[in-house]
Amino acid sequence: MMAVKKSRKRTAATELKKPRRNQLEALGVTTIDYKDVAVLRTFLSERGKIRSRHVTGLTPQQQRQVATAIKNAREMALLPMAGPR
């Protein structure tokens, strides 16, 4: 008699990933302002780099707004420039 193989069902990679929480919604922020340094710091790494939207869970439009606000705040010397590589 031949042994019967058990079929293993693979789970898709998308089923394993849980959806990222939108950090702006979690903070209760509706408009992004370059003067709101406390909120903008949550989107910076410890080296001062802007975090990707895959990390922050932002929409593409929100990510562009956050990036622009961070760049404006850097120009006004409210936030530090990115650190050494």
From Swiss-Prot:
Keywords: Ribonucleoprotein, Ribosomal protein, RNA-binding, rRNA-binding. One of its GO terms (biological process) is translation. It holds the Pfam family Ribosomal_S18. GO terms for molecular function: small ribosomal subunit rRNA binding; structural constituent of ribosome. It comes from the Bacteria. Part of the 30S ribosomal subunit. Forms a tight heterodimer with protein bS6. Binds as a heterodimer with protein bS6 to the central domain of the 16S rRNA, where it helps stabilize the platform of the 30S subunit. This is Small ribosomal subunit protein bS18A. It comes from Mycolicibacterium smegmatis (strain ATCC 700084 / mc(2)155).
